[in-house]
Amino acid sequence: IESHLIAALQNRADQPVIHAMRYAVSGGKRLRGFLVLEGARMLGLPDHRALSAAAAVEALHAYSLVHDDLPSMDNDDLRRGLPTVHVKWDEATAVLAGDALQTLAFELLTDPALGTGDTRIALVAGLAKASGAEGMVLGQALDIAAETAKTPLTLDQITRLQAGKTGALICFSAEVGAILAGADRAPLRRYAAALGLAFQIADDILDVTGDEAKTGKRLHKDAEAGTATFVSLLGLDGARARAAALVAEAEAALAGY
């Protein structure tokens, strides 16, 4: 995935926006790309059939992080232990780099190696839905609205928010293999929905218990802002128990494979 993204950004203009794009896609856990490749492997597809889709979801994810870090959004100055894009360059460059990474994601989905035209259209439609006003963007909008809400979010509201902001792209990533193979998406969708929520709960737990030097980002933001989280609503032990239950649910969804 790393080399595919590097290749996609070669032979581009020697401009700050291109340097910022390369900076933004470097590093990270590659969870979403991993889900794309593993889902395809599980359904018997070779890596080259899914590689451009894996790079696409990572480019899309990188765009979302660049924009989320902006002062008008989450106002973060540290990401993966390094200065965020708007800090290293400036806000305008960060906005443009994010925009360009988003369009790069859809450019990558035109790769003929992904399959027929219908398959690629399904991938484009799926990524657009997961990242737009029904998915990730909706989740971020709900998150911003919660900052000025008169009452803290309920558990159901936080679950809905995170299903969009974090979960939608994770779900799409897991479903890519089924789209490529023409297989049933439902088991992978159930798996990823549970995994995505467990991932977010783990992130909330790390915000309370983690080490900034290891996580590479500023911690305790939610507590300082008085933002409701899974930990603030369930308690630390309750959040851990909920995450463990979701992991078991995710594993059960894959029992048929």
Give the role of each language-model region.
Residues 3:
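Glycine/alanine-rich phosphate-binding loops at beta-alpha junctions
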Residues 257:
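Short arginine-rich
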